[in-house]
Design a protein with these regions (language model features):
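A short, proline-enriched helix->beta-strand linker immediately N-terminal to the Walker B motif
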Residues: 148-152
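Internal alpha/beta loop-helix hairpins
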Residues: 180, 189-254
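Conserved ABC ATPase "signature" region
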Residues: 60-65, 108-125, 176-177
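Conserved ABC ATPase signature
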Residues: 129-133, 137
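ABC ATPase NBD coupling module
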Residues: 62-79, 103
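Catalytic Walker B motif of ABC-type/P-loop ATPase nucleotide-binding domains
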Residues: 154-158
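Glycine/charge-rich catalytic "coupling/switch" loops of P-loop NTPases
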Residues: 254-301, 324-351
């Protein structure tokens, strides 16, 4: 997908000015509430008309104020998944799914209904009314309806924000299937850096209606370590565990991690904040933290008044953070060895 968009839209107390050129299949739009993310995608989808400018998607002009071009939403072949699922309450799950499919010209119908139902695990829900579904089930149906419209681009506008944490991370694999299973590029809109890292490769950062930055999702997280109350969130995909003295032991890097909130499933995904990793220059004699990892510094970076420290523990990568004074006192440089202490309770299982 290649998108070029230079548009302006003025409201009573807000002006959006977008001037971007971006390519890729997994693009994120990041910003706080009210920054202009939804306005941006509404103009792209044709739901909102810019005051002036031009929008070109994959070589086709969707809007041009100078040329008098403004394709209708249905002509643009762009589907949307919203924060609120927006399903038709009088239709069954199956008929909700088929709604967009039936309105898609036959020449564009490349996605098989049965395949989609299997991938999104909707087999047992087809005859049910949507009002009886859980929040996660409704969002899967909304996603399926959008995919069956066979769009050339899918816009996902805060699709996880109405769900609790456990449901959010259950839904993410289904959202990723848009690109991985069906080959549809997407724009994913969110104010969550963790969601950006799980869902996107390239991120457009919007602030006060202006495109401020185009970067990778990983760099976005690193750039904000200094002013984020939760720091940098390490995401650890860990495999088979065993129980040890009331804790769960997971193989990791050059050794193991002891975790309180584990389980005995084959795989689990954990969050670990950079703020929960304490660094030592020498091996401490005795500490209460159950994990003490001998690591090698592979990079450092500054963000605000903090220093991010990227550590290698075997093949596992972790990012810790310290204040600049501590970085100087510990003489943290690339190649030096540090001990990372982490409490077993610091890990949060998210899937």
């Amino acid at each position: 997908m290649h998108l070029s968009m230079m548009v302006n839209k003025k409201f009573a107390s807000f002006t959006l000015a977008a001037d971007i050129t971006v390519s890729g299949d997994r693009i994120g739009i990041f910003g706080t509430s009210g920054s202009g993310k939804s306005t941006f995608v509404s103009m792209l989808a044709g739901l909102l008309i810019p005051d002036n400018g031009e929008i070109v998607l994959d070589g086709e002009c969707l809007f041009s104020s100078s040329k008098g071009i403004n394709l209708r939403p249905e002509q643009r072949r762009i589907a949307m998944v919203f924060q609120q699922h927006c399903l038709f309450p009088h239709l069954s799950v199956k008929n909700n799914l088929l709604y967009g499919f039936k309105r898609c010209p036959a020449k564009y119908r490349t996605i098989n209904f049965d395949t989609l139902v299997t991938v999104l695990k909707l087999e047992g829900l087809l005859d049910r009314g949507v009002t009886k579904l859980s929040g996660g089930e409704k969002q899967r149906v909304a996603l399926g309806r959008a995919i069956l419209a066979n769009p050339r681009l899918l816009l996902m506008d805060e699709p996880l924000s109405a769900l609790d944490d456990s449901l959010r991370f259950q839904i993410i694999p289904y959202l990723k299937s848009v690109s991985e299973q069906f080959g549809i590029p997407y724009l994913f809109i969110s104010h969550s850096i963790v969601e950006m890292r799980l869902m996107t490769d390239t991120v457009l950062f919007i602030e006060h209606g202006t495109m401020m930055e185009q970067t990778s999702s990983e760099q976005l997280a690193r750039n904000r370590i200094g002013n984020s109350p939760v720091g940098y969130i390490n995401l650890l995909q860990l495999g088979q565990s065993r129980q040890v003295d009331g804790l769960f032991s997971y193989g990791c890097g050059a050794g193991e991690l002891l975790i309180s909130a584990g389980n005995e499933k084959s795989e689990a995904l954990f969050e670990l904040s950079s703020k929960d990793i304490m660094l030592f220059k020498k091996h401490p004699e005795a500490i209460s933290a159950r994990n003490l990892l001998k690591c090698t510094v592979i990079s450092t970076f500054e963000s605000g008044n903090r220093v991010g420290v990227e550590l290698a523990y075997g093949e596992q990568r972790l990012i810790a953070e310290v204040v600049k004074q501590a970085a100087n006192e510990l003489n943290i440089v690339v190649g030096s060895e540090l001990y990372a202490a982490i409490k077993a309770s610091a890990f949060r299982r998210i899937r």
